[in-house]
């Protein structure tokens, strides 16, 4: 019956003792090992100690593989106490055996400020390549699958990407199974709003972490036949004739507080080409329509109210892009935001010709409603490289802003008719064949306020968003595999 070797973090000995006591209640537990940082010399009776450098390193993963002798490996990655539900560990073991999974994980409860909350997680897909995919804090591995994956890990030097590399390797040969049952309770340590957490990967202090994660993901794409070499289709910008050099598109619904600022920031632009502004007003009811009409005397403004009622943000974009007055380049501006200067459009259009790209992504600065800079400040996505950006794009959670497109390419691909992830989906699709260029000057001020769509999401909405983006990645991964097979 002793089928599991458990490995738990031993950074807080007092807290770890509670978890050890919990595990020792189960007959299925064979051995308990304490993953111990170098500076801790204590131990717990009945447990073995494994000295580690970091919890997520390749070295730690290999030490676990060497120590494990039972059929299954359990890993708990938090220092706070763990509490199982009734027969929960047996349930997890049962599903692991029945499904022949390489790894299983489950929904869980959290204790936040003394309050118990439900914390469902999402299913794992081929495209679940985010290194911050939430498996919870307790997961169970088939030991044979774990050891096979460890042997196939090509980099032994990861300090941060070892566990990520492991699960990618496991996913290549066996299933990663989500048990949508609440099997344990953990104590929440990161209580920031979702809108703050989503920018963790661009925090400069996390840069070395991101370099390792990119390396692990890139190797995974090579392993599964989805890696794309840095060879891109060239763009011939003079093949089609346009009346306007560029169009800014603003999809909007009920943004009476901000729409005038957004429109004004476009109309103030100074360029050496003709441009216009296409505002797709998705049946606003709060006075936004009337606010847009205040600019009707400016011939550059095209105000569209769709004749259909089923458009998301992506659908509004498609309507603007396919308007006969749309310019050669299509440039994004959200209705909450403004351009940082009067030369933004000129810089973007110049970059298309200099970099020969089908899409350009700029740099933006986070501000409050009064345009004062707030953390995390400037979002420049310097993790992007011309050589590997389109591969790493399958791992990160967004491409940045402002986004701009060569209109003929965008008209051909089109955006999904959604109000989340539509920009990411089309960016991935474009990057499959074309180079995406970058501008590292701040072009755009992104205002965060209570009505932003991702300012603070509940767990259900966050899961919905993450599941959809993983689906987008899955479809793109499949398309790239197909593309690679055609080239053989």
Region spans (language model):
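Acidic donor-binding loop at a coil-to-helix junction in glycosyltransferase catalytic cores
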Residues: 157-166, 419-426
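Short, acidic, metal-binding catalytic loop of nucleotide-sugar glycosyltransferases
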Residues: 21-30, 264-274
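A recurrent flexible, glycine/aromatic-enriched loop bordering the glycosyltransferase active site
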Residues: 117-144, 383-404
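Glycine-rich, basic loop-to-helix element that forms the pyrophosphate-binding segment
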Residues: 54-67, 307-325
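Short beta-strand-to-loop acidic/aromatic patch adjacent to the donor-nucleotide binding site
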Residues: 70-83, 327-338
């Amino acid at each position: 019956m002793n089928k599991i070797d458990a490995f738990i973090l031993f950074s807080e000995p007092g807290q770890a003792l509670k978890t050890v006591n919990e595990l020792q209640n189960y007959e299925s537990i064979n051995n308990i090992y304490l993953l111990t940082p170098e500076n801790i010399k204590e131990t717990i009776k009945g447990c073995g100690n494994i000295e580690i450098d970091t919890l997520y390193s390749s070295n730690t993963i290999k030490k676990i593989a060497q120590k494990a002798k039972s059929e299954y490996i359990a890993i708990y990655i938090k220092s706070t106490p763990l509490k199982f539900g009734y027969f929960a560990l047996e349930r997890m073991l049962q599903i692991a055996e029945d499904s022949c999974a390489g790894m299983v994980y489950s929904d869980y409860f959290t204790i936040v400020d003394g309050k118990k909350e439900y914390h469902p997680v999402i299913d794992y897909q081929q495209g679940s390549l985010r290194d911050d995919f939430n498996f919870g804090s307790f997961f169970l591995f088939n030991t044979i699958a774990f050891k096979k994956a460890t042997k196939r890990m090509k980099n032994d030097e990861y300090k941060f990407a070892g566990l990520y590399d492991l699960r990618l390797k496991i996913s290549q040969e066996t299933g990663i199974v989500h048990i949508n049952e609440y099997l344990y309770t953990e104590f929440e340590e990161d209580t920031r709003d979702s809108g703050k957490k989503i920018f963790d990967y661009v925090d400069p202090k996390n840069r070395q972490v991101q370099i390792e994660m990119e390396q692990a993901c890139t190797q995974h794409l090579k392993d599964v036949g989805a890696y794309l070499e840095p060879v891109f289709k060239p763009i011939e910008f003079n093949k089609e004739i346009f009346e306007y050099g560029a169009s800014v598109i603003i999809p909007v619904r009920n943004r009476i507080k901000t729409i005038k600022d957004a429109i004004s920031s476009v109309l103030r632009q100074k360029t050496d080409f003709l441009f216009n502004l296409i505002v797709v007003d998705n049946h606003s009811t709060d006075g936004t329509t009337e606010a847009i009409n205040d600019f009707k005397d400016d011939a550059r403004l095209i105000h569209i109210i769709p004749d259909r009622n089923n458009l998301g943000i992506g659908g509004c974009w498609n309507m603007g892009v396919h308007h006969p007055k749309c310019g050669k380049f299509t440039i994004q501006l959200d209705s909450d935001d403004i351009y940082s200067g009067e030369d933004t459009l000129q810089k973007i259009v110049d970059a298309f010709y200099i970099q020969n790209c089908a899409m350009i992504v700029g740099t933006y600065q986070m501000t409050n409603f009064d345009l004062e800079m707030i953390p995390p400040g400037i979002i420049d996505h310097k993790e992007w490289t011309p050589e590997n950006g389109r591969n790493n794009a399958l791992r990160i959670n967004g491409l940045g802003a402002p986004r701009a497109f060569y209109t003929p390419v965008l008209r051909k691909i089109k955006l999904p008719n959604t109000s989340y992830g539509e920009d990411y989906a089309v960016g991935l699709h474009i990057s499959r064949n074309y180079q995406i260029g970058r501008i590292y000057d701040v072009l755009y001020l992104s205002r965060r306020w209570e009505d932003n769509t991702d300012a603070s999401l509940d767990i259900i909405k966050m899961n919905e968003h993450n599941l959809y983006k993983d689906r987008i990645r899955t479809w793109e991964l499949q398309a790239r595999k197909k593309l690679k097979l055609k080239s053989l």
